[in-house]
């Protein structure tokens, strides 16, 4: 009797538990934007694209998130000349990431920001060989 009650309670709790959720896509988009900003703003830096793809998988992002975010970032940074416009939510996430990154760069100064990114984004950016 106790075993049956335990099983029913366990099954009920499992049914009520929220499903595992992917980490916030906005956090991933910000990470990507910072990696690409470091490539452009910090001399001798390049992006390790495959590691960004792996990070998306680790964060349980939907397939294609890295590529759609890359295209949206390019589209916004080039005024629509490169990349592709993403859905409104993605474009909002990219715009917010751009604003926060810009504020960080101004607050810290570019050299300090670059030095910080080398540590913060280790694995996603590296020095050019």
Residue ranges and their predicted role:
Residues 16-22:
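Sec/Tat signal peptide C-region and signal peptidase I cleavage site
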Residues 6-15:
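Bacterial N-terminal signal peptides
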Residues 16, 36, 107-108:
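Processing junctions and N-termini across compartments
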Residues 54-129:
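Compact alpha-helical subdomains of small soluble proteins
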Residues 22-51:
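Immediate post-signal-peptide N-terminus of mature secreted/exported proteins
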Residues 1-5:
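Positively charged n-region of N-terminal signal peptides that target proteins for export
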């Amino acid at each position: 009797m106790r075993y049956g009650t335990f099983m029913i309670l366990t099954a009920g709790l499992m049914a009520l538990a929220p499903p595992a959720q992917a980490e916030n896509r906005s956090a991933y988009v910000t990470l990507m934007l910072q990696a690409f900003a470091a490539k452009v703003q910090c001399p001798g830096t390049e992006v390790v694209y495959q590691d960004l793809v792996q990070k998306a998988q680790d964060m349980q992002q939907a397939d294609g998130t890295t590529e759609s975010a890359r295209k949206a970032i390019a589209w916004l940074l080039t005024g629509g000349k490169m990349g592709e416009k993403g859905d409104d939510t993605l474009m909002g996430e990219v715009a917010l990431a751009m604003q926060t990154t810009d504020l960080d760069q101004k607050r810290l100064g570019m050299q300090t920001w670059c030095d910080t990114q080398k540590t913060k984004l280790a694995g996603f950016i590296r020095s050019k060989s």
